[in-house]
Swiss-Prot record:
Complexes and interactors: Interacts with SH2 domains of tyrosine-protein phosphatases PTPN6 and PTPN11. The interaction with PTPN6 is constitutive. Interacts with the SH2 domain of CSK. Binds with high affinity to extracellular matrix collagens, the interaction is functionally important.
Record membrane topology: Single-pass type I membrane protein
Start-end of Polar residues biased regions: 134-145
Entry annotated with the keyword Protease: no
Pfam families for the chain: Ig_2
Gene Ontology biological process terms from the UniProt entry: adaptive immune response; immune response-regulating signaling pathway
Protein name according to UniProt: Leukocyte-associated immunoglobulin-like receptor 1
Record keywords, A-Z: Adaptive immunity, Cell membrane, Disulfide bond, Glycoprotein, Immunity, Immunoglobulin domain, Membrane, Phosphoprotein, Receptor, Signal, Transmembrane, Transmembrane helix
Side Cytoplasmic, residues: 187-287
GO CC terms in record: plasma membrane; specific granule membrane; tertiary granule membrane
Topology Extracellular: residue spans: 22-165
PTMs per UniProt: Phosphorylation at Tyr-251 and Tyr-281 activates it. May be phosphorylated by LCK. N-glycosylated.
Glycosylation site positions: N69
Organism whose genome encodes this protein: Homo sapiens (Human)
Length: 287
C-alpha cells in the first residue's frame, strides 16, 4: 500500500503533540501594591503584576472582572520574570476593593493571581497612623479562586481542547477516506487487467451470425431441390415404394450446384448467375 497514509498519520500525531504542549498550564502571576495596600485618600498607588518571560499583555482586574485595564508596556524584571505596572495617581474611596492580575502569553491566557485588597482611608496625619510606610510592598490577600469568572476570558482553555479534538477527528476521517480511495483504485486496476466478464461472449456472437445465415440458406436450398423434382420422378418413386417388399426405398435428389454455391451465396448474395443443372439420384434403403 502507498506510504502516504502512514506519513500523514505521523504528521497528525506530531501536530497533536505540539498543541498538547501549548495547552500546558502557565504559571500563575503575582500581584503587589506600592507603597502598600492601605492608602490615604488622595495618595497614589501602583499595582505591580509579575509573570514569566515572554508575556505579551498584562491585565489588572477589579471586583471579579467587572472592571479591568490592559497594558502591553511589559518590562523584564529579571532574566526569568517580566512585570507591568498600573498606577493610580489619586486614590478615591471608589478605588477600594479586590484586585488581581492575569497575563496573555501566546497562544493562551494564564490563570488569575491571588486577590489583593486595597483599603482607602482618610488621612489622619498622626504619627501612630496604621498606614503602610512608603516603599513597603504588601503581599496579596489569599482568597479562594473563583473559577466561575473564567467565562469572560478572551481565549478560553476549553475551546482550545475542543479544537484539538476536532482536529484529531477530522484527521482520522480523512485517513479513512484516503484508505477507501486507495482500495477502490486497486480494485479498479484489477478489473482493468482481467477485462470485462462478458467480452468473450460478445466476441463469439458475431461469429455465430454467418453460421446461422449459412444454415438458413442450406435449408432453403434443400426445400427447393425437393420441390423441383419432375412429376415423372415422383411417380417413379411412388411406384417403387408400392412394388417393394418388406424394404422401403427412398430416393434423395442431390443438387451439386446448390451444394457448391451455398457458401458463395452467404458471402455475396448478389451473385444470381444460373449454372448448368446437375442432378444425381441415390437410393437409400430403409429397414
Amino acid at each position: 500500500m502507498s506510504p502516504h497514509p502512514t506519513a500523514l498519520l505521523g504528521l497528525v500525531l506530531c501536530l497533536a503533540q505540539t498543541i498538547h504542549t501549548q495547552e500546558e498550564d502557565l504559571p500563575r502571576p503575582s500581584i503587589s501594591a506600592e507603597p502598600g495596600t492601605v492608602i490615604p485618600l488622595g495618595s497614589h498607588v501602583t499595582f505591580v503584576c509579575r509573570g514569566p518571560v515572554g508575556v505579551q499583555t498584562f491585565r489588572l482586574e477589579r471586583d471579579s472582572r467587572s472592571t479591568y485595564n490592559d497594558t502591553e508596556d511589559v518590562s523584564q524584571a529579571s532574566p526569568s520574570e517580566s512585570e507591568a505596572r498600573f498606577r493610580i495617581d489619586s486614590v478615591r474611596e471608589g478605588n477600594a476593593g479586590l484586585y488581581r492580575c492575569i497575563y496573555y502569553k501566546p497562544p493562551k491566557w494564564s490563570e488569575q493571581s491571588d486577590y489583593l485588597e486595597l483599603l482607602v482611608k482618610e488621612s489622619s496625619g498622626g504619627p501612630d497612623s496604621p498606614d503602610t510606610e512608603p516603599g513597603s510592598s504588601a503581599g496579596p490577600t489569599q482568597r479562594p479562586s473563583d473559577n466561575s469568572h473564567n467565562e469572560h476570558a478572551p481565549a478560553s482553555q476549553g475551546l482550545k481542547a475542543e479544537h484539538l479534538y476536532i482536529l484529531i477527528g477530522v484527521s482520522v476521517v480523512f485517513l479513512f477516506c484516503l484508505l477507501l480511495l486507495v482500495l477502490f483504485c486497486l480494485h479498479r486496476q484489477n478489473q482493468i487487467k482481467q477485462g470485462p466478464p462478458r467480452s468473450k461472449d460478445e466476441e463469439q456472437k458475431p461469429q455465430q451470425r454467418p453460421d446461422l445465415a449459412v444454415d438458413v440458406l442450406e435449408r432453403t436450398a434443400d426445400k427447393a431441390t425437393v420441390n423441383g423434382l419432375p412429376e415423372k420422378d415422383r411417380e417413379t418413386d411412388t411406384s417403387a415404394l408400392a412394388a417393394g417388399s418388406s424394404q422401403e426405398v427412398t430416393y434423395a435428389q442431390l443438387d451439386h450446384w446448390a451444394l457448391t454455391q451455398r457458401t458463395a451465396r452467404a458471402v455475396s448474395p448478389q451473385s444470381t448467375k444460373p449454372m448448368a443443372e446437375s442432378i444425381t439420384y441415390a437410393a437409400v434403403a430403409r429397414h
